[in-house]
């Protein structure tokens, strides 16, 4: 089965329609409240902001969490979006140890939150790596929660499970365990679903994994950031679209994407706090 999946991934770009390259649009990521987030109330975050004006954030996920350069490395969904024939999820995973870029969307979120909430101090710790399963991220999550108190956890996951066609039930159980661990640690959780990719949508059955994320987002203190729907909306409405970006603009497009995601994620968190 894994051999067949790798073959499908390799030929995936050939199954997609021919795309015309375009420059980065003037308004790459217009803001829309509709469909950006689902469920949840970040009560712990809100209370922390009222009493201390300081937010400790743990971001756990794939290479994307470390910034544009890491997300463009061979073997990622972003590189596949640009036509790479490399299997985006290698048979073995790799935990990254370098510090995240200031352009990474979790740090861009922090930057925007400081603007939205004057006087706020935000510290972000990023953990994760390329090709990690949710179960591997859960181990990182447990380790970090035991070592330090965080107010907010951002957990980006689901792509590897979908590409490998792993049991959605096990994925959902892993998410539930992680959400409970975050709650027990006195923090709130924002889940982040896979990024939009025509390649990924063509070669994977994403729905069961989206459903698992949605179900867990109904738990207390959990929200779902609908990155996939957000990016698809931008692509369909003439906004940023990695798969149709001119080769000369690709690096700039990924930097722009991280800034857009950070801005929208900050708006989602801030609106929940005020709600």
Language model regions located:
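Catalytic His-Asp segment of secreted/periplasmic serine-dependent ester chemistry enzymes
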Residues: 197-275
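N-terminal secretory targeting modules
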Residues: 1-60, 64-98, 118-120, 253-275
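Active-site segments of SGNH/GDSL-like serine hydrolases
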Residues: 156-159, 179-211
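Residue-level recognition of beta-strand->loop/alpha-helix junctions
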Residues: 126-128, 193-194, 226-229
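Extracytoplasmic/secreted envelope proteins and their assembly/folding machinery
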Residues: 42, 106, 110, 138-142, ...
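Loop/turn elements at helix/coil->beta-strand transitions in domains of secreted/extracellular proteins
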Residues: 53-56, 120-122, 148-153, 184-190, ...
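Oxyanion-hole/transition-state-stabilizing segment in secreted/luminal serine hydrolases
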Residues: 58-60, 65-74, 111, 115-120, ...
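Second-shell loop/turn segments in exported
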Residues: 64-71, 91-100, 131, 161-168, ...
């Amino acid at each position: 089965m894994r051999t067949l999946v790798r073959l499908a991934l390799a030929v995936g770009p050939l199954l997609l329609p021919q795309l015309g390259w375009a420059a980065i649009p003037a308004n790459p990521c217009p803001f829309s409240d509709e469909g950006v987030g689902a469920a949840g109330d970040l009560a712990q975050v809100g209370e922390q902001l009222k009493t201390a004006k300081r937010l400790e954030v743990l971001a756990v996920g794939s290479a994307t969490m470390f910034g544009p350069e890491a997300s463009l490395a061979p073997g990622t969904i972003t590189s596949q979006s640009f036509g790479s024939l490399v299997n985006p999820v290698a048979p073995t995973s790799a935990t990254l140890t370098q510090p995240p870029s200031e352009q990474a969307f979790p740090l861009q979120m922090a930057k925007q939150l400081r603007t939205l909430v004057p006087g706020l101090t935000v510290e972000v710790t990023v953990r994760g790596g390329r090709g990690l399963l949710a179960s591997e991220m859960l181990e990182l999550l447990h380790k970090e929660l035991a070592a330090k108190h965080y107010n907010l956890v951002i957990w980006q996951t689901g792509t590897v499970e979908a590409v490998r066609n792993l049991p959605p039930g096990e994925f959902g159980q892993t998410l539930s365990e992680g959400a409970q661990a975050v709650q027990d640690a006195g923090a709130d959780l924002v889940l982040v679903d896979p990024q939009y990719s025509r390649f990924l949508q063509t070669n994977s059955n994403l729905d069961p994994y989206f459903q698992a994320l949605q179900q867990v987002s109904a738990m207390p203190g959990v929200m779902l950031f609908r990155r996939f729907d957000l990016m698809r909306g931008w692509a369909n409405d003439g906004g940023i679209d990695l798969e149709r970006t001119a080769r000369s603009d690709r690096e700039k497009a990924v930097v722009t994407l991280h800034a857009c995601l950070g801005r929208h994620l900050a708006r989602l968190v801030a609106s929940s706090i005020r709600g």
